[in-house]
Amino acid sequence: MPSLMSFGSCQWIDQGRFSRSLYRNFKTFKLHEMHGLCMPNLLLNPDIHGDRIIFVCCDDLWEHDLKSGSTRKIVSNLGVINNARFFPDGRKIAIRVMRGSSLNTADLYFYNGENGEIKRITYFSGKSTGRRMFTDVAGFDPDGNLIISTDAMQPFSSMTCLYRVENDGINFVPLNLGPATHILFADGRRVIGRNTFELPHWKGYRGGTRGKIWIEVNSGAFKKIVDMSTHVSSPVIVGHRIYFITDIDGFGQIYSTDLDGKDLRKHTSFTDYYPRHLNTDGRRILFSKGGSIYIFNPDTEKIEKIEIGDLESPEDRIISIPSKFAEDFSPLDGDLIAFVSRGQAFIQDVSGTYVLKVPEPLRIRYVRRGGDTKVAFIHGTREGDFLGIYDYRTGKAEKFEENLGNVFAMGVDRNGKFAVVANDRFEIMTVDLETGKPTVIERSREAMITDFTISDNSRFIAYGFPLKHGETDGYVMQAIHVYDMEGRKIFAATTENSHDYAPAFDADSKNLYYLSYRSLDPSPDRVVLNFSFEVVSKPFVIPLIPGSPNPTKLVPRSMTSEAGEYDLNDMYKRSSPINVDPGDYRMIIPLESSILIYSVPVHGEFAAYYQGAPEKGVLLKYDVKTRKVTEVKNNLTDLRLSADRKTVMVRKDDGKIYTFPLEKPEDERTVETDKRPLVSSIHEEFLQMYDEAWKLARDNYWNEAVAKEISERIYEKYRNLVPLCKTRYDLSNVIVEMQGEYRTSHSYEMGGTFTDKDPFRSGRIACDFKLDGDHYVVAKAYAGDYSNEGEKSPIFEYGIDPTGYLIEDIDGETVGAGSNIYRVLSEKAGTSARIRLSGKGGDKRDLMIDILDDDRFIRYRSWVEANRRYVHERSKGTIGYIHIPDMGMMGLNEFYRLFINESSYQGLIVDVRFNGGGFVSQLIIEKLMNKRIGYDNPRRGTLSPYPTNSVRGKIIAITNEYAGSDGDIFSFSFKKLGLGKLIGTRTWGGVVGITPKRRLIDGTVLTQPEFAFWFRDAGFGVENYGVDPDVEIEYAPHDYLSGKDPQIDYAIDALIEELRNWNEELPQRPS
């Protein structure tokens, strides 16, 4: 029996009185720190100097005195502090601060312990993610200068290099040692930690990007001294030994070696949590573990927990703007709408004057009209999703006990008798709204059945059924099935030879409409010889009663027979297209004398792929009588239709929700969702978010048996840390460690809402600067292809190369020893500014140029073009060069940009170093497999190869440890298919794919490894190992220092050698 919960009578809230009193009380209460109710905290990133310890707690920086036991907060309100290091003299502290809602930028500050001054040092807005920390403290040189590691001036975000900071950030001197995370000094020698960042989200990592340690030898070269089979992180030096964290024995422990990488010793035997964040004052080592701080004395091998005590318990309420976290919305009867925000459901009128919260604790996912004065909703727990009913007239709620799995789509029939839900078990089912009893209609073998509709007479359910004709088919198709509630029988509405979708019934339930990719008409590619099917969707209609006329054809009634009975047998034979040109259609809504079609114009995928930009749709109206199509609304991202088919609710690209009557679309109104602030408990939210993160991992990890064993073992272990979490970043630390227990790639946390501090901004002009006396000089200006958009420093637009020019001022503000150029540029990002340049011989230039927000792409294209020129010159015009930065849209762009020219050289280098992965490697492999077998011989002009997109001669691919995911797959495929030699270093080793489908209540995206990649010969072995090259060529720190690229040099030499024995046959015109 369903459990019945009564919440008493319903009270509508007068919005004006509520909002004023809530905000007034909140402002007063928020300032009050509840010291009497302090709870233990999560303590992170400690460092030590003498008797002073610093650490991060509640996003702020604290200091603890080991002698007195006193603790005080020393830096707060900067953003989220996640790292801090004492300078060697202990007078200053370098602090890393992350900003932006999802902590997507980071910069460094100095804190002066003598006078309390806080000063921003870097203006790089370095990339920041939960899995790697860019623009961070790398170490200190023997003179006490800070050395940072940053990706800010590099062509790749995964390439962090070392810079010495001079004059409090006025000057940054590159060390030119290549990728590095840490730098230490021992006996006057530099010790480099490459990739020695933390990997809490991937415990047990063994791939090519695992941390390694190099040391400088007497010759000025570097040698690798620590290269274990597992990851190495947080290196520090005490005496003549290097200490670090690794889990070579299966669990994270502190190990050490001597300065030659020998005499490996294990110092700890932890079994609860991994140690993290090693730091030292040269005598003792400090670290955090399980939210507490410990001190390790290498001389005595003793470990002590530092008892700091309870510090801070911020007020356990968070107030949010509902529209910022809106997840689901739905029209109800009359002027009422329902929507879900931050896991809570609300019913309100359009104006927002009256707002009613559905009285169900977190977490609600969907809410739909459930009949007169009722809504049906899906709410989730860590066990699964459940159905509930709420009567907003009486205030009574009913929650059913049947676990529906993880629900990803929900609908309710117009009469409020049953709901239809689709879950991740690939089931579509009905749920009786009286008893809560679920009945499975059908289960797919291939995918979720989320594309469904219910007829207005509540008799039929039509849905898109995913299918493949064989277990190893490459494509999942979709056919329309119809379930008859009266006969409890399934009927095929379409054949199984295409992708049929978006079924919809008309108001009298006599006709079934749907969309289909059946109108194939290829469009030519404008860059290479290729075609694509861009506008293939067309609407179709099926009369459900045999003998009934097509409702979109104006057949006189006198010429048609009387309507008979429903007969769904062989209904696919009655399908006919509607007279609308093909397009990219997503939804169809039949009305009495017209049809609404939701269409998305053809567009590029770049913004959607990299920025998550929603597709902008257009609502079209097809008039059956005139057969004309008109535009109703544009810039839409989502759409809902009311039960009576009279009102439409839409979300637009501005993120707001609007409603309008179909009879008068111009009478559009904004749904005012933000008049009532959303109030929630931080503690309750964090527990729910942890539970959901744990459940997502349990239910989506690709190996079900392994997921069950791990999930049950770790649940309580990490949930015990959640009460210590007082900020969202605290919780993030717990969640990523929990995910890391699966020891598999692609376990990420992305996005979310961590702080209200705006992201750091940076201003760029695609130039490097160096300080010459009191002035900045342009050390290098970057450009790729000067004719391409966005590929050169804006200074080049004036026809001068600014290299060597002195920068006197920017908009009249002198920059140099007394004024940081990076600060000045950051304040002008996105605008134009006048820059005064001074060259040799008194040459002065005043230039108005655009200050860029980012210049990485320019630096990337400059790097590619420099490599291409080098390859062409060194091979004397016989070898071409292509770099592929990822296997996404940018990777496709860069491949085709160069392939059409570079493939015609006798040899070809395909460089996938630093490849960020994606999914298009197979498209690129397909092109590289094309070998020339003939030529077209014109009377005039030159030869044209056949196939047109084909490789002329020999190929070599270069890969490295930063090539991962689909970059791993490309590297293995290139090698396996024998396309040429693969050289470089072992790849990242992450090939269990992801398709994130759910967000946490604050917008956080969590990914779970769902699709394990298997190769012939390698099996599942590429995961957590990588791909070994045919020839290993290391790129050592001293190679970067000397300006050499040994991997490209080897590739050129190897291709030249192969071409010695390559005989090319070209056509000779007959006489």
UniProtKB/Swiss-Prot annotation:
Its EC number is 3.4.21.-. PANTHER family: TRICORN PROTEASE HOMOLOG 2-RELATED. Optimum pH is 8.5-8.8. Residues 131-132 are annotated as: Binds the substrate's C-terminus. Changing H746A: Loss of catalytic activity. Substrate binds at G916, G917, G918, G993, I994, T995. This is Tricorn protease. Residues 39-310 are annotated as: Six-bladed beta propeller. InterPro entries: ClpP/crotonase-like_dom_sf, PD40, PDZ_sf, Tail-specific_protease, Tricorn_C1, Tricorn_PDZ, Tricorn_protease, WD40/YVTN_repeat-like_dom_sf. Belongs to the peptidase S41B family. It is found in: Cytoplasm. Residues 679-745 are annotated as: C-1. It is thought that substrate reaches the active site through the seven-bladed beta propeller channel, while products exit via the six-bladed beta propeller channel. GO terms for biological process: proteolysis. The record marks D936 as: Substrate specificity switch. It is an enzyme of class 3 (hydrolase). The active site is at H746, S965, E1023. Keywords: Cytoplasm, Hydrolase, Protease, Serine protease. It comes from Thermoplasma acidophilum (strain ATCC 25905 / DSM 1728 / JCM 9062 / NBRC 15155 / AMRC-C165). The record marks D966 as: Transition state stabilizer. One of its GO terms (molecular function) is serine-type peptidase activity. Optimum temperature is 65 degrees Celsius. It comes from the Archaea. Residues 856-1061 are annotated as: C-2. The keyword Protease applies. Pfam families: PD40, PDZ_Tricorn, Peptidase_S41, Tricorn_C1. Gene3D superfamilies: 2-enoyl-CoA Hydratase, Chain A, domain 1, 2.30.42.10, 3.30.750.44, Tricorn protease N-terminal domain, YVTN repeat-like/Quinoprotein amine dehydrogenase.
